[in-house]
Amino acid sequence: MSPQERDHSILEGALGLARESGLESLTVRAIAARVGVTPALVAHYRPGMDAFVADVFGSIVADEREEVISAFDDSPFRDTDELRGGLLRLIETLLDADRDDVTLIWVQAWALGARNEALAARVRQEMDGWQSVLEGIFARAAADGAIEAGRADTAAWLLLAMVDGMNAHSLVKWAPRDRADLARRALSAVLDSAAPDALVGARSSDAGSADTRSTDTRSTDARSTDSRSPDSRSTDT
């Protein structure tokens, strides 16, 4: 086996081990046992385990991002419903229980990154990658008039934070069983945050009208009560 092939086999072994047991399982001995070589050989090809763990993490999560985002083409969003449909599919995909192996890798990377600067840097890079991709989708939606312009970054950040949080919760079974419904509610919150000002204004106007009607009703009731009061007193007298 050539040096390149040997290095590739070590990487593939580490990738498989991480998917099965998470990043915390990546030790020189565990990888060596997985590949069927000596620990010394693994250490020879990958002398820095911190950097190797970062490489394994980056490879797995970058592949997932490419797979998920490939479902979005460059065609314009004709309306908000079309944007909603596309994003709903994306969220449902990311919340799918079949992806819990990648979720565990993300969660462990956030924790291990506190002591592994190479991993921390790669985590930031991959999160920036997700933020950039999602911003691009929302920016296209804004250009097509589906959401308010200038809110793509906020919408992308909110979507990413909610998906990451809900996925982390699911690892300890602290999440609704109906993930599809969870996805719909999450998406509604994101799109409401990026709704055009006209729509927000309409909601405010409706709320204001309701308040005005309520106030008018109370005023009318008060006047009616006042007009009845003198009559009542006169009758009593």
Segments (PLM) and residue ranges:
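Helix-turn-helix
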Residues: 6-9, 16-55
